[in-house]
């Protein structure tokens, strides 16, 4: 059969909508077209995928290849579609069986040698994949991040050949076993503050009652120091909230913070940030 459909995920803020990579091989002069609103990095995947397939000792089909990234109205950006496109071409050309395609999602960048490279902002995709009850095949470099999502089968690979062997059933990929999570205990504590009894009492009342709190005074009196200790008074995040915070860090490429922590985040914008709205919400040119 010369038509194959592979599942992957796009990046849209902290959302990860499903993308179906539809690959069709037809007769005619050899050509390679990608449609479905692809950005520049996605268009460039044609060269990466071709080289990866050839260097992995597969046969690149000398036919007219049309790839549709559906839904077509959703913008596609980044290199995360490389693996799904390659698997779709191999499946449509009969070099990889289609039996297990529906049970998996594929996300990863391909090197010219066929090696798998990690991508940014994977955690929202892993969360969405878990909701759809599919296994996720990714680069080993993304395995720890994806494993933060419970009830998700994470299948890390280092090369396109490993993914092919898994699809054939010869050498199934082993599910990633995350190491025990060590939660951060370095949060500033209110008992470290000497003095400021009235301010500390105000923090306790605001934390227990869920009230807003305004701290004002001359520079150097400890306003930021006190505010940074408010998360230590608040209840821990539940699992869904912790994953949402980690997803935001993942999208912001703060990989050092994209970990499963139950501590509530603390943000401290500069005092001059109120001059413009973009300083608070981001954006601009």
Locate the predicted segments by residue.
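P-loop NTPase nucleotide-binding/switch module
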Residues: 168-205, 209, 240-285
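Peripheral, non-AAA+ core regions of ATP-driven protein-machinery
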Residues: 1-228
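Short, exposed beta-strand "edge-strand" segments with a Pro/Gly-rich flavor and a Y/T-containing core
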Residues: 151-158, 230-237, 267-275
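Walker A/P-loop
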Residues: 215-259
């Amino acid at each position: 059969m010369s038509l194959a459909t592979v599942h992957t995920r796009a990046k849209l803020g902290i959302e990860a909508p499903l993308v179906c990579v539809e690959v069709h091989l037809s007769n005619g002069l050899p050509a390679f077209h990608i449609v479905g609103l692809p950005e520049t990095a996605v268009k460039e995947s044609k060269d990466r995928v071709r080289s990866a397939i050839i260097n992995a000792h597969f046969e690149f089909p000398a036919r007219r290849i049309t790839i549709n990234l559906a839904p077509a109205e959703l913008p596609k950006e980044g290199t995360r579609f490389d693996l799904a496109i390659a698997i779709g071409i191999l499946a449509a050309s009969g070099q990889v069986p289609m039996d297990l395609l529906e049970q998996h999602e594929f996300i990863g960048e391909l090197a010219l040698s066929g090696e798998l490279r990690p991508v940014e902002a994977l955690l929202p995709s892993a969360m969405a994949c878990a909701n759809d009850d599919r296994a996720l095949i990714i680069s080993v470099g993304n395995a720890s991040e994806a494993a933060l999502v419970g009830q998700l089968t994470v299948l890390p690979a280092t090369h396109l050949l490993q993914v092919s062997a898994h699809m054939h059933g010869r050498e199934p990929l082993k599910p990633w076993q995350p190491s025990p999570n060590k939660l951060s205990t370095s949060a500033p504590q209110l008992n470290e503050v000497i003095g400021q009894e009235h301010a500390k009492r105000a923090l306790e009342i605001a934390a227990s009652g869920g009230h807003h709190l305004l701290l004002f005074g001359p520079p150097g009196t400890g306003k930021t120091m006190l505010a940074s200790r408010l998360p230590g008074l608040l209840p821990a995040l539940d699992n869904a909230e912790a994953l949402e915070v980690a997803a935001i860090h993942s999208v912001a490429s703060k990989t050092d913070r994209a970990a499963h922590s139950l501590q509530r985040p603390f943000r401290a914008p500069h005092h001059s940030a109120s001059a413009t709205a973009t300083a608070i919400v981001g954006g601009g040119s």
